[in-house]
Amino acid sequence: KGGNMVVQYNTNRGIKVDKIAPFDLQLSRDRVTDETAEVTLLAPNHEVLNFPNKITTKDFEGWTQERGLYFPDQWSSDFTPILSMHDKDETAKTGSLLVAKHGKGYYIYTGLSFFREFPVGVSGAYRLFANMLSIGKQDITNDNGIKN
């Protein structure tokens, strides 16, 4: 009936990269190491930034060590790039969070460093991850006929 799959960063060494996503996705070594690098919301009205939490650039304050790594640098038009960021004197990286509708669910690839943010309690990281898990659920009616 459809579900969601969230894939967190991977290296392109030793895995079948062509099988990592239902659509074309090319992993790279692109990364943003400055944890204070400015984040731009490319798709501010996208569900992943609005339900159940309204994600703003403030949610990226207090991140530790880095923004993310192994961002894809090429992908199918089935994906929507959600964020843009870059280190000083680098080009913008737009592959840190990619969302694609797939069947009745969603496929999400993220290179964001949640594994660094969760242990130190970065609330914005938790809020964004909750949204990734909740995508597609905004208009679901529960078993009692009550719309969430």
Language-model region placement:
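Sequence-pattern detector for short linear motifs
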Residues: K16, G68-Y70
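A glycine-rich, often tryptophan-bearing local segment used as a flexible ligand/cofactor-contacting loop or short
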Residues: K1-G62, G124, L128, S134
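Extracellular ligand-binding/catalytic regions of CAZymes and related secreted enzymes
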Residues: A21-Q26, V32, K58, Y70, ...
